[in-house]
Amino acid sequence: MSDVLKSSQERSRKRRLLLAQTLGLSSVDDLKKALGNAEDINSSRQLNSGGQREEEDGGASSSKKTPNEIIYRDSSTFLKGTQSSNPHNDYCQHFVDTGQRPQNFIRDVGLADRFEEYPKLRELIKLKDKLIQDTASAPMYLKADLKSLDVKTLGAKFDVILIEPPLEEYARAAPSVATVGGAPRVFWNWDDILNLDVGEIAAHRSFVFLWCGSSEGLDMGRNCLKKWGFRRCEDICWIRTNINKPGHSKQLEPKAVFQRTKEHCLMGIKGTVRRSTDGDFIHANVDIDLIISEEEEFGSFEKPIEIFHIIEHFCLGRRRLHLFGRDSSIRPGWLTVGPELTNSNFNSELYQTYFAEAPATGCTSRIELLRPKSPPPNSKVLRGRGRGFPRGRGRPR
């Protein structure tokens, strides 16, 4: 029994020594003062010996501060990488103190430095970007009201459709910014979006990416995918940082308690596409389903450009359509359609000629070697009841 007690006391001594080193104390004896245990013990003893006397003197002593009392003015003491009185991180408290969102401290989120420690992935991204640039068609754009436009007149079936509707949710978050180019901005409800004839312009195997906000759009977006003939297969989440302009209230909806700092882009699939066998059409697992980038100015509805990189890296189809695009989103390899465009250059016949010979970007041998692939299927092995013998009434001796 004495050995067990000695072992327990030794472990306790080591824990106190380690805690003292963590808190930067010179000796273990200072732990009581640093953690406040000494004051608690003294007050407990005083309470037991003379409760009435302490109660009488309580009013006079309550206004006096303890000489060694630590007063925290902010949460910098509790952040990662500092000498801390509490080894835990508290980025939520730091947001209350400074307005810096917790996601501001996630490292290596940019496209340039994301794969610095992964040379093969870095080479893969570089090669794919070069191939996409070389095979991209000339950018085309069409200024049109999508409520009255018959999308069948585009005369093409698309491999990828990116939809970026001006949701009423955005108007609730920023009611003061309801104009574009001096004209009132038209916001769409989900019934209008549901009536878009997206299924008619989607190829037999294709993908749709629908920005749906962060509230009721998650459910309504799934209804849209279902009506258009797509199956939801992924949810890309955009986490907005505020490193450049920290603050507490940027886009707060009426009667809202919390500020929304993320937005969702639902991904749908049409037809049968398997990543293990359809390497000529998709390259899976090249990017992640998370975008972390700085939010735009107040009232801006711009989405991160990284969504284009994710789509182009994933789907090798070259027929790409962007609905509700703007002048800032015109991009080689894409047909951009939207009411906020200032000009048009779309020609249906010319657009068709771009894909007559090569509807996909193709793939080089080096990209095929570097890209992540699905594991090979398990080989079928006959399994018996014991020692690997096949099933049967008997076995040869």
Swiss-Prot record:
Coiled-coil intervals, chain numbering: none
Result of knocking out the encoding gene: Flies have a reduced lifespan and exhibit multiple behavioral defects: flight and locomotion are severely affected and they spend more time grooming. They also display a mild held-out wing appearance resulting from failure to fold their wings together over the dorsal surface of the thorax and abdomen.
Pfam families listed in its UniProt record: MT-A70
Keywords for this protein: Differentiation, mRNA processing, mRNA splicing, Nucleus, RNA-binding, Sexual differentiation
Keyword ATP-binding in record: no
Biased composition, class Basic residues, residue ranges: 382-397
GO annotation, biological process: cell differentiation; female sex determination; mRNA modification; mRNA processing; regulation of alternative mRNA splicing, via spliceosome; RNA methylation; RNA splicing; sex differentiation
Principal cellular location given in the protein's record: nucleus
TM region(s), chain numbering: none
UniProt entry tagged with the keyword Nucleus: yes
Designated name of the protein: N(6)-adenosine-methyltransferase non-catalytic subunit METTL14
Taxonomic placement: Eukaryota, Metazoa, Ecdysozoa, Arthropoda, Hexapoda
